Amino acid sequence: MIFPAIDLRAGQSVRLYQGDFKQATLINPDPVVQAQQINAAGLQQLHMVDLDGAKSGRPENFATITAIRQAFTGTIELGGGIRTYELATRYLELGIDRLILGSVALTDPRLVKRLLSEFGGERIVIGLDGTNGYVAIKGWLEQSQTKMSTLMKTMTTSGAKHFIVTDVARDGTMQGPNLALYQELQAQVPTANLIASGGVRNLTDVQVLQASGFKDVIIGKALAEGGVTLAELAGVTEC
């Protein structure tokens, strides 16, 4: 599946460079319109992140997320600051299809295990973000001492099936995806489904990832800068 990305900051769609909040580029002042454009192109998946929430641990763009959920007819996965059971269930009740749990997978694994047990591995997805193989947390503002592979194995034991893997150093850079990282993690946990995120430049990158076995790909900056079009991505999903 192809997941166009919308990252929310102060109610607008932006892109960060290597997760740096000081290096934000405005993509669309009205992310609802952006979501509708994705739908209109024939794409039925949307990856969304509350960047402000990722920093604060609170729902900072709830009204915008609600409006996008009402406007977008397909599947929405959402991450960013989901660190309590109450917020997780609030988003699920809103109609969000899949929740992405990042920092909390490291800081509160019992909560993640509870959510996985209650809602299942199809609705609870683990966001595995890292630098040099180590997990980054709290909106990528902190780097932990835990290896990405270690956390992945722990979460698999807890019932996780899907992992969105992002090399922070590649995110928003248009330098190409870190295929070697995906292959290394996949080799360590063969049963997991890895969703590639970060660095995708064009349609060729998508095709290389899929040919390598990584069928699910998230695309953000390449869409904003014209490296790939929604129409091209819609064609990929039809193959």
UniProtKB/Swiss-Prot annotation:
Cellular compartments annotated: Cytoplasm
GO biological process: L-histidine biosynthetic process; L-tryptophan biosynthetic process
GO-annotated cellular components: cytoplasm
The entry's keywords: Amino-acid biosynthesis, Cytoplasm, Histidine biosynthesis, Isomerase
Disulfide bonds: none
Pfam families: His_biosynth
Keyword Amino-acid biosynthesis carried by entry: yes
InterPro entries found in the cross-reference section: Aldolase_TIM (IPR013785), His_biosynth (IPR006062), HisA_bact_arch (IPR006063), Isoase_HisA-like (IPR044524), Isoase_HisA-like_bact (IPR023016), RibuloseP-bd_barrel (IPR011060)
EC numbers on record: 5.3.1.16
Annotated active site: D7 (proton acceptor), D129 (proton donor)
MF-aspect GO terms: 1-(5-phosphoribosyl)-5-[(5-phosphoribosylamino)methylideneamino]imidazole-4-carboxamide isomerase activity
Ranges in a coiled coil: none
Cytoplasm found in the keyword field: yes
Pathway where it operates: Amino-acid biosynthesis; L-histidine biosynthesis; L-histidine from 5-phospho-alpha-D-ribose 1-diphosphate: step 4/9
Enzyme class: isomerase
Catalytic activity: 1-(5-phospho-beta-D-ribosyl)-5-[(5-phospho-beta-D-ribosylamino)methylideneamino]imidazole-4-carboxamide = 5-[(5-phospho-1-deoxy-D-ribulos-1-ylimino)methylamino]-1-(5-phospho-beta-D-ribosyl)imidazole-4-carboxamide
Family affiliation: Belongs to the HisA/HisF family.
Protein name per its UniProtKB record: 1-(5-phosphoribosyl)-5-[(5-phosphoribosylamino)methylideneamino] imidazole-4-carboxamide isomerase
Organism: Lactiplantibacillus plantarum (strain ATCC BAA-793 / NCIMB 8826 / WCFS1)
Record gene name: hisA
